[in-house]
From Swiss-Prot:
InterPro entries recorded: Ribosomal_uL4, Ribosomal_uL4-like, Ribosomal_uL4_dom_sf
Keyword Ribonucleoprotein: yes
Keyword Methyltransferase: no
A biological process from GO: translation
Function according to Swiss-Prot or TrEMBL: One of the primary rRNA binding proteins, this protein initially binds near the 5'-end of the 23S rRNA. It is important during the early stages of 50S assembly. It makes multiple contacts with different domains of the 23S rRNA in the assembled 50S subunit and ribosome. Forms part of the polypeptide exit tunnel.
Keywords: Ribonucleoprotein, Ribosomal protein, RNA-binding, rRNA-binding
Protein name in the entry: Large ribosomal subunit protein uL4
Organism field: Clostridium botulinum (strain Eklund 17B / Type B)
Gene name of this polypeptide: rplD
Length: 206
């Protein structure tokens, strides 16, 4: 079983914690990671883009000038694509970009992302994380103790004081463990997670 240090909010190690090898010590599957990240980003797209083709643009029903004898290039409609205010060739239309990923692949990707954080030494486990009131200064001091800059912080439950303490800090995101996803794990350089959140992850993915 992989073992990592257990720290308090001040950045001092208070012990060690053993992680479940079925979650934090698996073979990293880069293909699954890629597939899941692509799907997550695709599913975020609104798909509301739209433009008019030459058949949908208003006007242009009459030939702008006769075919021959003017010395100008022949034209059939002022709404042809080459005209200003003309239609768009292969105009984008609203569409659904949603991609479906099998549950088994999502689980493999999640375990791979968590394992990569442990392997890279970028995972910090906190004994607990709580603030009586939102305190950005204290939060910054905690991050400095772990030399954390671009950081994802995962808590066991939604904590308003913790969230408000971090929301104005650039490159830092706080999410409850129920909202964890592969993209965020890979996007942020360091992962700071509470002991209770680790237990919840192991319950679901072990």
């Amino acid at each position: 079983m992989p073992t990592v240090g257990l720290f308090n909010q001040e950045g001092k190690q208070v012990g060690d914690i053993q992680l479940n090898a079925n979650v934090f010590e698996v073979e990293v599957n880069k293909h699954a990671l890629h597939q899941v990240v692509v799907a997550l980003l695709a599913n975020k797209r609104q798909g509301t883009q739209s433009a008019k083709t030459r058949t949908e643009v208003r006007g242009g029903g009459i030939k702008p000038w006769r075919q021959k004898g003017t010395g100008r290039a022949r034209q059939g409609s002022i709404r042809a694509p080459q005209w200003i205010k003309g239609g768009i060739v292969f105009a984008p239309k609203p569409r659904d970009y949603r991609v479906s990923i099998p549950k088994s692949m999502r689980r493999v990707a999640m375990k791979s992302a968590l394992t990569s954080k442990v392997n890279d030494g970028q995972m910090v486990v906190l004994e607990s994380l709580s603030f009586e009131a939102p305190k950005t200064k204290q939060f910054i001091e905690m991050l400095s103790a772990f030399n954390a800059k671009k950081t994802l912080i995962i808590t066991a439950e939604s904590n308003e004081a913790v969230y408000k303490s971090a929301r104005n800090i650039q490159g830092v995101s706080v999410i409850p463990v129920n909202n964890i996803n592969v993209y965020d794990l890979l996007k942020f350089e360091k992962l700071i997670i509470t002991k209770d959140a680790v237990s919840k992850i192991e319950e679901v993915y072990a």
